[in-house]
């Protein structure tokens, strides 16, 4: 048994979890990550249950893998993540060729589950919620060759929005200890990482491992991270408006390396719908926090998530959402049609919105958001932006790509020696999904990627 293949669905936290699965099995079993599932001895599917038909997507993928198992019975197939947590034994009954089923909070038990599967010759299922165990058993991350990295600092959510499965699949809010986070980030920076994105389902609810008053929240953590030599940029996602406190707003003005971009999901511009969603904030409270963010950090860009067609959403409710979009002028937001998710309170709500109406509203909303985003991109043409070069462009391996502070992708000509540097880049063109630029100044050697 030598090769491991992992396919990941969903958010950045799942990407982080997949990295840790690979790290864990590399240490415990010497498994090497490969890009081709045909070569794998162990295939893992890390799943997401946020959107409609998530379960169907999982079983379709497992169907693609089933022939590997039929040709080589010794191949191990595992399913992790939120669909695994949600389905448990039902997943095994529908796909009996699956050997491992594990939840987001038990990925650290993968070595034991794999050993038991091989020794006992029978499937293993573990979808418990031992939050403390997961953070206490994260392996040391091996050397990296990239300029950016994700670091999970918080998991779960206590907000219980009526449309959301997260509390049922990831559990209640739990924060990682600050010393552990600082150690991991220092190690990553020593390996050459220059930008860190802190992750959590409700990341600004971070309160340290004990949750005691005075231990330090997200603002305190950001201040400590900003002192690490060599770290050039910080981000965090995803935030809940109810937990965006005064200290965190002030941090956007005082911490220079904190990116002037915040993803702050609002979901709807109607107070009536926000109440039905159990969002724990009003439109007015949201606007007040946006105003204070922009006062603390002029030029900060705000992106959001929107759900259209939530049960009971009227034309007036949708119009209120469009008014909010115009008022805030969101940048690069995500929007979705409401879909029923298992075990959520919204399943009991009546007054469902017809599918055709959902589609029409989504098209209108996305058109407005895309127009605002393109207008902002066009306004960057002719300006100089600090761009962290992250590697070769996916479209053209002879070019480089990087990110602006406001999270815009920029492609430019240059040398691979620039990877890991923060460059001043003149923006020369705005394309639908990216910017083009020209390097104006190469950063000093001290800012280059360690190799």
Swiss-Prot record:
Keyword Cytoplasm included in the entry's annotation = yes
Query: Which residues are involved in binding [4Fe-4S] cluster 2?
Result: 157, 161, 164
The MTTase N-terminal domain, residue ranges: 2-119
Cofactor(s) required for function per UniProt? [4Fe-4S] cluster
Q: Which Gene3D superfamilies match?
A: Methylthiotransferase, N-terminal domain, tm_1862 like domain
Q: Which Pfam families does its entry note?
A: Radical_SAM, TRAM, UPF0004
What's its EC? 2.8.4.3
Keywords for the protein's UniProt record, in alphabetical order: 4Fe-4S, Cytoplasm, Iron, Iron-sulfur, Metal-binding, S-adenosyl-L-methionine, Transferase, tRNA processing
Domain (Radical SAM core): give its ranges.
143-377
Main localization (coarse): cytoplasm
Localization in the cell = Cytoplasm
Q: Name one GO cellular component term.
A: cytosol
Query: What is the top EC class of this enzyme, as a single word?
Result: transferase
SMART domains from the xrefs? Elp3 (SM00729)
TRAM domain segment(s): 378-441
Described by its record, this protein's role is as follows: Catalyzes the methylthiolation of N6-(dimethylallyl)adenosine (i(6)A), leading to the formation of 2-methylthio-N6-(dimethylallyl)adenosine (ms(2)i(6)A) at position 37 in tRNAs that read codons beginning with uridine.
* Subunit and partners: Monomer.
According to its UniProt record, which protein family does this protein belong to? Belongs to the methylthiotransferase family. MiaB subfamily.
**Identification of the protein by name:** tRNA-2-methylthio-N(6)-dimethylallyladenosine synthase
